[in-house]
């Protein structure tokens, strides 16, 4: 059995790490490189960086900090933000990222997933899915351009259908960003994770809602996700990664303990 992964998420805007609640009202957390170093030292398995306004601004992620991060950490990291071509991806990977993640650009052009997978291999192609639970229809809907609350909009995709589609097109991993739970710290949406796990045959990463060590445990134990991504609990030092991994190991979760 592969070890489960603990993945801090760093949302980047204007060169700094920020964090919002339900993808809105972002506050500045701090500088990118020191935070990356801290999480690597605490025992994170990998890091994810989202340049959250790149797609809505029509630009590619700023590469200057990608190279700086690569110089100071020795764990894998993934970068997302406005990657719309094989050439964009090539630059990010050349600057030192281990994986690239696409979200809104994949919705605009699903063939991008296949082109990237064919060029670089599925192992480094992640598809991020921003999913919103609509209470009226009791359904999960895919959203795009979520980094800019003025431009955020629903797509025509149901989350379940998009999860199936991106796998067919070559996604090597899926990060499910559950917007209703984002930054609220009341636990991952286990029902949604279980529903998507049943149809997801590539690594599935839970994102949105972590507030306590037990929330991570529930995601691994009850939804069988491959990794759990979180931001505010790590940024604000509510949870220490090393202590979290020790707790999960004691509960029987297969995890790399520092």
UniProtKB/Swiss-Prot annotation:
* GO annotation terms (biological process): L-histidine biosynthetic process
The protein's matches in Gene3D superfamilies, at most eight in alphabetical order, are given as: Aldolase class I
Q: Which UniProt keywords apply?
A: Amino-acid biosynthesis, Cytoplasm, Histidine biosynthesis, Lyase
InterPro entries in UniProt: Aldolase_TIM, His_biosynth, HisF, IGPS_HisA/HisF, RibuloseP-bd_barrel
Q: Which GO terms describe its cellular component?
A: cytoplasm
One of the entry's Gene Ontology molecular-function terms is:
imidazoleglycerol-phosphate synthase activity
Keyword Lyase in the entry? The reply is: yes
Where is the major localization of this protein?
cytoplasm
Give its localization: Cytoplasm
**Active site positions, chain numbering:** 11, 130
Q: Known catalysed reaction(s)?
A: 5-[(5-phospho-1-deoxy-D-ribulos-1-ylimino)methylamino]-1-(5-phospho-beta-D-ribosyl)imidazole-4-carboxamide + L-glutamine = D-erythro-1-(imidazol-4-yl)glycerol 3-phosphate + 5-amino-1-(5-phospho-beta-D-ribosyl)imidazole-4-carboxamide + L-glutamate + H(+)
Name the PANTHER family for this protein: IMIDAZOLE GLYCEROL PHOSPHATE SYNTHASE HISHF (PTHR21235:SF2), IMIDAZOLE GLYCEROL PHOSPHATE SYNTHASE SUBUNIT HISF/H IGP SYNTHASE SUBUNIT HISF/H (PTHR21235)
Q: What does the function comment of this entry state?
A: IGPS catalyzes the conversion of PRFAR and glutamine to IGP, AICAR and glutamate. The HisF subunit catalyzes the cyclization activity that produces IGP and AICAR from PRFAR using the ammonia provided by the HisH subunit.
Which family does the record claim for this protein?
Answer: Belongs to the HisA/HisF family.
The record, for NCBIfam families, names: hisF (TIGR00735)
What protein name is recorded for this chain?
Answer: Imidazole glycerol phosphate synthase subunit HisF
Q: Look up and give the organism this protein is from.
A: Yersinia pestis (strain Pestoides F)
Which lineage do the record's taxonomy fields give for this organism? Bacteria, Pseudomonadati, Pseudomonadota, Gammaproteobacteria, Enterobacterales
């Amino acid at each position: 059995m592969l070890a489960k992964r603990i993945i801090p998420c760093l949302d980047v805007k204007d060169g700094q790490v920020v964090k919002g609640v339900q993808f809105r009202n972002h506050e500045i957390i701090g500088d990118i490189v020191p935070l990356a170093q801290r999480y690597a030292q605490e025992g994170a398995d990998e890091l994810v960086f989202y340049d959250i306004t790149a797609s809505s601004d029509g630009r590619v992620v700023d590469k200057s900090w990608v190279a700086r991060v690569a110089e100071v950490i020795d764990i894998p990291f993934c970068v997302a933000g406005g990657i719309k071509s094989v050439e964009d991806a090539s630059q990010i990977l050349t600057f030192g990222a281990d994986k690239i993640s696409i979200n809104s650009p994949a919705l605009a052009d699903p063939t991008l997933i296949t082109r990237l997978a064919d060029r670089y291999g599925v192992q480094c192609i992640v598809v991020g899915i921003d999913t919103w639970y609509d209470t009226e229809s009791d359904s999960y809907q895919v959203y795009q351009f979520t980094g800019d609350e003025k431009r955020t909009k629903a797509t025509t995709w149901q989350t379940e259908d998009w999860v199936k589609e991106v796998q067919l097109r070559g996604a090597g991993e899926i990060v499910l960003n559950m917007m209703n739970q984002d930054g609220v710290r009341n636990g991952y949406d286990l029902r949604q994770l279980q529903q998507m796990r049943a149809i997801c045959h590539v690594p599935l990463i839970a994102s949105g809602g972590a507030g306590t060590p037990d929330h991570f445990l529930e995601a691994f134990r009850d939804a069988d996700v491959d990794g759990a991504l979180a931001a505010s609990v790590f940024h604000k030092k509510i949870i220490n990664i090393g202590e979290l991994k020790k707790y999960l190991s004691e509960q029987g979760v297969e995890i790399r303990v520092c």
